[in-house]
C-alpha cells in the first residue's frame, strides 16, 4: 500500500457476544508487575527494568505487554521521571499491577491478532495509569510497539479492532 496505494475494508466483530481479545489491569499490593495469559495458562512476575526490557525474547507470551509497559514509561529513557528501580517507580505510582490477557483467536490466524492485542494492552495500561491516550494515540503507539518487537506488523490492523463497525482504511 505504501508504494502502490490501496485501501482495506475492515469490520470489527465480537465472538459469542464478547470482544475476542480482552485485557484487564488491576492494582497489586506488592510493588511488582504480574503478567497472566488465561488462554495460554502462563504467568510471569516482573520485578526489574531488565525483565521489562526483555520483550524481544522469542516465543514469550508476554512480549507485547512488556513492550507496552516500556511505551507507557515503565523503563528508563521512556519516562519523564527518573527512578533507581522498577520497584521505586511502582511505589511512586502507588501500587504494582496485574495485567491479564485473554485471546479467543489463535496467534498466526492472519486476523491482525497481535496488532489488536497490542492496542488493547496499550489502552488498558493507559486507562489504569491515567495516561489519557485517545484511540489515535493508542493506534500510533501500536505501530511503535511493533517496531520495537521487530515484527513489522501491518499498518492498519490495530484500527480494525480499536474502531467499531465497518471501515475503509
List where the protein language model places each region:
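ATP-binding N-lobe of GHMP and related small-molecule kinases
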Residues: 1-111, 123-135, 140, 163-169
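Active-site signature of alpha/beta-hydrolase-fold catalytic machinery across serine-
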Residues: 120
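Short, conserved phosphate/pyrophosphate- and ester-handling motifs at nucleotide-, phospho-/glycolipid
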Residues: 114
Amino acid at each position: 500500500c505504501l508504494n502502490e496505494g490501496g485501501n482495506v475494508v475492515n469490520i470489527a466483530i465480537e465472538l459469542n457476544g464478547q470482544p475476542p481479545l480482552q485485557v484487564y489491569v488491576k492494582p497489586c499490593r506488592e510493588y511488582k508487575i504480574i503478567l497472566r495469559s488465561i488462554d495460554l495458562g502462563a504467568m510471569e512476575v516482573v520485578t526489574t527494568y531488565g525483565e521489562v526490557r526483555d520483550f524481544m525474547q522469542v516465543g514469550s507470551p508476554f512480549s507485547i505487554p512488556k513492550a507496552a509497559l516500556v511505551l507507557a514509561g515503565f523503563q528508563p529513557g521512556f519516562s519523564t521521571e527518573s527512578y533507581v528501580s522498577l520497584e521505586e517507580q511502582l511505589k511512586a505510582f502507588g501500587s504494582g499491577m496485574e495485567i491479564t490477557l485473554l485471546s479467543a483467536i489463535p496467534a498466526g490466524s492472519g486476523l491482525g491478532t497481535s496488532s489488536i492485542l497490542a492496542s488493547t494492552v496499550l489502552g488498558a495500561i493507559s486507562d489504569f495509569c491515567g495516561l489519557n491516550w485517545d484511540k489515535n494515540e493508542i493506534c500510533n503507539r501500536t505501530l511503535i510497539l511493533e517496531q520495537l518487537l521487530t515484527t513489522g506488523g501491518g499498518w492498519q490492523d490495530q484500527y480494525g479492532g480499536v474502531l467499531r463497525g465497518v471501515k475503509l482504511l
